[in-house]
């Protein structure tokens, strides 16, 4: 896209959404960086999903005068679920557990979650699949983690039922490759307390420490255990965090908020062109 844009030189306002720095492919970044800088310098506006990412990104620091923040948003969820499906999941996993939803990738911190599950013995349900699935399942089996349940990939209805049944959402991503954290938004939509790591990205924009949940140091399984115990042993605190996460979702992270922000941005750019 960037090469096409630079070669075409369109006579139109240009907006690019910047989701993530190049984190893992550092050698590739050295080759790509000159092209990236030319491309970002040429556009009229860069959209980032959180002020946290703008502040921590070495790339975006060069373009703060043209960068705006528009968070990702989700639709409100007021659907009544099939009682039989709810009963199935309540029988399968109960209605008081910590929920992880996501791809099994190197930056998701699943090894940290398994370590915390072993130390705390608290119930954990893991939803998803991906490149590391076999490895993660094997590790859980070798550790004898009978308190950890793997569901595999689920459709939206089953996933949303688990959000409603869980005690809290755990999101132990420990690397900046996790640029935002849609799972945290989904948890907030269902008024769940959240646990995430401070990695300088949108995860700490969605989840505020001691407001909507717990923000812990990355790659620290003991800190994760302590956060899980806080939510498990203090129902009043857990409920307050959940109410706050839902309120924050309604105030900042709905699809309507996102759409309105983009409409306002496009309108402003078009008016400035004319």
Kindly give the residue locations of the regions a language model identified.
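Short hydrophobic beta-strand element within catalytic cores of glycosyltransferases
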Residues: 170, 189, 193-197, 207
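Acidic donor-binding loop of glycosyltransferase active sites
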Residues: 98, 164-179, 192
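Donor nucleotide-sugar binding/catalytic pocket of nucleotide-sugar-dependent glycosyltransferases
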Residues: 36-82, 93-95, 150-151
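An aromatic- and histidine-rich active-site surface loop
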Residues: 1-11
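A short, well-ordered alpha-helix in the C-terminal region of glycosyltransferases
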Residues: 223, 230, 237-252, 258-264, ...
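Nucleotide-activated donor-binding/catalytic signature segment of Leloir-type glycosyltransferases, i.e.
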Residues: 122, 137-157
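Conserved acidic donor-binding segment of nucleotide-sugar-dependent glycosyltransferases
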Residues: 208-221, 228-236
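A conserved mid-protein helix/loop that constitutes part of the nucleotide-sugar donor-binding site
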Residues: 96-119, 131-137, 222
């Amino acid at each position: 896209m960037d090469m096409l844009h630079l070669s075409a030189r369109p006579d139109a306002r240009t907006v690019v959404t910047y989701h993530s720095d190049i984190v893992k492919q550092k050698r590739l970044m050295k080759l790509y960086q000159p092209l990236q800088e030319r491309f970002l310098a040429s556009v009229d506006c860069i959209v980032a999903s959180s002020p946290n990412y703008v502040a921590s990104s070495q790339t975006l620091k060069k373009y703060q005068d043209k960068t705006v923040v528009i968070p990702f948003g989700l639709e409100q969820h007021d659907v009544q679920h099939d009682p039989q499906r709810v009963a199935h999941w309540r029988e399968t996993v109960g209605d008081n557990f910590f929920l992880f939803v996501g791809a099994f990738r190197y930056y998701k911190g699943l090894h940290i979650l398994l370590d915390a599950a072993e130390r705390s013995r608290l119930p954990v349900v893991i939803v998803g699949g991906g490149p590391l699935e076999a490895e993660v399942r094997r590790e859980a089996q070798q550790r004898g983690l009978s308190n950890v349940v793997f569901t595999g990939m689920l459709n939206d209805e089953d996933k949303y039922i688990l959000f409603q049944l869980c005690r809290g959402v755990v999101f132990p991503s420990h690397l900046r490759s996790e640029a935002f954290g849609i799972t945290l938004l989904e948890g907030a939509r269902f008024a769940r307390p959240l646990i995430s790591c401070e990695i300088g990205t949108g995860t700490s924009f969605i989840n505020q420490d001691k407001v909507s949940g717990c923000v812990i140091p990355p790659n620290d399984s003991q800190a994760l255990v302590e956060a899980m115990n806080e939510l498990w042993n203090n129902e009043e605190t857990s409920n307050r965090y959940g109410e706050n996460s839902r309120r924050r979702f309604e105030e900042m992270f709905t699809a309507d908020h996102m759409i309105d922000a983009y409409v306002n941005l496009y309108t402003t750019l078009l008016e400035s062109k004319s």
